[in-house]
Amino acid sequence: MAKAAEQKQNPTVASAEAKLDIRDVVNTAITYGEDNRHGGGKRNDVAMFVLRAMCMAVSTVAVTLMVTARETSMTTLYGFEFQLHAVWSLSDSLIYLVVVSSATVLYSLIQLIISGTRLMRKSPVIPTRTQAWFCFVADQIIGYAMVSGGSAALGVTNMNRTGIRHMPLPNFCKSLGFFCDHLAGSIVFALFAFLLLAASSLLDVLHLSRHR
């Protein structure tokens, strides 16, 4: 009789132990997943901080190159010698690029300060879904403004290098090499800033998926 009772109790004990084991596995998996999300979030926060710093630096270089683009030189057309005076502020497209790049510098600086402060406090750089949406939309707007400014300035630079096909105008960049090089450099850095903003947008999407 004792053996029979013992055999009846064994399945119950085994079932209880199995339930405990399953709970332990589930709890361990949940803890592991949370740790992974936390670690991934920290890496994304650091990556976001680095991208903001790089974007601010690159945009600053773009502005600096553009506002220092000025040169006076001489050129010959139809046997006559003319003085050329090139300044970035004479073109609306170049002014637009400077304004957009300056706005990107200011935006990146604000985001950099916020990110750095939160990293020092060991809190999430983007703590809420609403802020993630705001950063995503802002990155998209600033990014497309940068690429539009770079495209507009590229047209001016290309015309300076090739002249105008329907008019016998020379390649002004042969005489204004310093000016054209600064324009080209500013455009390259502006487009690079756009790529950095696009990368920041991807991190914004990751934050949005995490805050579902």
Swiss-Prot record:
Localization annotation: Cell membrane
Superkingdom to which the source organism belongs: Eukaryota
Positions on the Extracellular side per record topology: 67-93, 157-182
Annotated Gene Ontology cellular component terms: plasma membrane
The keyword Acetylation belongs to this UniProt entry's keyword annotation: no
Record topology, Cytoplasmic segments: 1-45, 115-135, 204-212
Keywords per UniProt: Cell membrane, Glycoprotein, Membrane, Transmembrane, Transmembrane helix
Quaternary structure and partners: Homodimer and heterodimers.
Name listed for the protein in its UniProt record: CASP-like protein 3A1
Naturally occurring in which organism (per UniProt): Arabidopsis thaliana (Mouse-ear cress)
Taxonomic lineage: Eukaryota, Viridiplantae, Streptophyta, Embryophyta, Tracheophyta
